[in-house]
């Protein structure tokens, strides 16, 4: 999928780029796989903001995605590759021979008309889903389960992939997109190949209006606020923050502060930490 640039007819489009959507083969989604999607505006059940800079945006329907890939030994034909506004990756519509339809994350190289399978006996082919125990070492994979039967949770965004490094007893060693090497149960499933839409990272938003359509509101600098709103606020003119290092609106260190819980139960499954 390529990137389209524009002539600088206005300041907004001078730097803006968009995807050419060459991989998309169908515009209208499958209605039976749509569900309403309500917006929270970053508020919790009490109406308090728990995530800042959220609100507005265009209306969307949620596409029900099959992350579990548990329909074993039944052939499925790739009917179309579609755009999904809820994620960076594209999605592929599968028509199973028994009449059922499902969406999956579209991997790189998946073509309309191909037949794909799920299950331990499936071939090592792009789009097929197998348990890690049945996948050869060195294979590029995505949509990886953390717990058997729970559904894929790792390597699902555009261009992402992981690699199966080794198998040791009950666990497989998988190198994640972050560079972390982690133990995962060999019964967990993964899909062969790399997630498609690789050029997503090269898209330049270009103007604030596109961010607003995505449901993202402006981020105000703390130094532009009053002292009762932010630790960086106040002062005459453009004042320094008056602290050794920047902090969050709640006074926590803002840069390089580790937020992962210490002594977390899953730490024992991390063989090599992620790149920093």
Swiss-Prot record:
Region entry Disordered, spans: 219-276
One example GO MF annotation: transferase activity
Presence of keyword Ribosomal protein: yes
SUPFAM superfamilies recorded: Nucleic acid-binding proteins, Translation proteins SH3-like domain
Record-level GO BP terms: cytoplasmic translation
A Gene Ontology cellular-component term: large ribosomal subunit
SMART domains: Ribosomal_L2, Ribosomal_L2_C
Function recorded in the entry: One of the primary rRNA binding proteins. Required for association of the 30S and 50S subunits to form the 70S ribosome, for tRNA binding and peptide bond formation. It has been suggested to have peptidyltransferase activity; this is somewhat controversial. Makes several contacts with the 16S rRNA in the 70S ribosome.
UniProt xrefs under PANTHER family: LARGE RIBOSOMAL SUBUNIT PROTEIN UL2M, RIBOSOMAL PROTEIN L2
HAMAP family: Ribosomal_uL2_B
Family as reported in the entry's similarity comment: Belongs to the universal ribosomal protein uL2 family.
Quaternary organization: Part of the 50S ribosomal subunit. Forms a bridge to the 30S subunit in the 70S ribosome.
Name used for this protein in its record: Large ribosomal subunit protein uL2
Lineage of producing organism: Bacteria, Bacillati, Bacillota, Clostridia, Peptostreptococcales
């Amino acid at each position: 999928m390529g990137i389209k640039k524009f002539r600088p007819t206005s300041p907004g489009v001078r730097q803006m780029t968009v995807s050419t959507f060459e991989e998309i083969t169908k515009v209208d989604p499958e209605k039976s796989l749509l569900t309403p999607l309500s917006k929270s505006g970053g508020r919790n059940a009490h109406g308090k903001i728990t995530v800042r800079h959220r609100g507005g945006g265009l209306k969307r329907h949620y596409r029900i995605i099959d992350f579990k890939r548990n329909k074993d030994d039944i052939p499925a034909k790739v009917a179309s590759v579609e755009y999904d506004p809820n994620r960076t990756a594209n999605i592929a519509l599968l028509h199973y021979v028994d009449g059922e339809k499902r969406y999956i994350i579209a991997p790189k190289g998946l073509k309309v008309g191909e037949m794909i399978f799920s299950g331990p006996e499936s071939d090592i082919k792009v789009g097929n889903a197998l348990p890690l125990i049945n996948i050869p070492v060195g294979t590029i994979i995505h949509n990886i389960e953390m717990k058997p039967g729970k559904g894929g949770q790792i390597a699902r965004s555009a261009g992402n992939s992981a690699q199966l490094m080794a198998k040791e007893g009950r666990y497989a060693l998988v190198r994640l997109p972050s560079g972390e090497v982690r133990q995962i149960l060999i019964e967990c499933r993964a899909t062969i190949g790399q997630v498609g839409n690789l050029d997503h990272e090269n898209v330049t938003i270009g103007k604030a209006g596109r961010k607003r359509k995505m449901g993202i509101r402006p981020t105000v600098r703390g130094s532009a606020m009053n002292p009762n709103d932010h630790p960086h606020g106040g002062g005459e003119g453009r004042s320094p923050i008056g602290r050794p290092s920047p902090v969050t609106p709640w006074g926590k260190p803002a840069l390089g502060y580790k937020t992962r819980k210490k002594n977390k139960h899953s730490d024992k499954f991390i063989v090599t930490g992620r790149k920093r």
